[in-house]
Amino acid sequence: MSTILTNEEKAAIVSQHIKNIEYSIDNLEVSIIEEEAVQAPDSNKISNLNSDITELNAKKAALTAELATLSA
């Protein structure tokens, strides 16, 4: 048996995913600060962290667009 969610319930789920992504982005930004603070920062690690942030921002944009359709 499948349950049909209302748009409001779906929007709440999407909003929570967006919030989780925002936490992840903040965490990655702190990791960059930490890496830049060491004697010899690893530029590859910083680059990878920035790539991860870019991917998360793309996911956040997609979810934000989905949230807009659910709220319309």
Give residue spans per PLM region.
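Amphipathic alpha-helical coiled-coil segments
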Residues: 24-28, 48-72
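Charged, low-complexity interaction regions
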Residues: 4, 34-46
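Short, intrinsically disordered, low-complexity terminal segments
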Residues: 8-9, 34-37, 58-65
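A general, composition-driven signal for non-globular sequence regions
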Residues: 4, 11, 39, 53-54
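Short, charge/polar-rich alpha-helical segments
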Residues: 1-30, 34
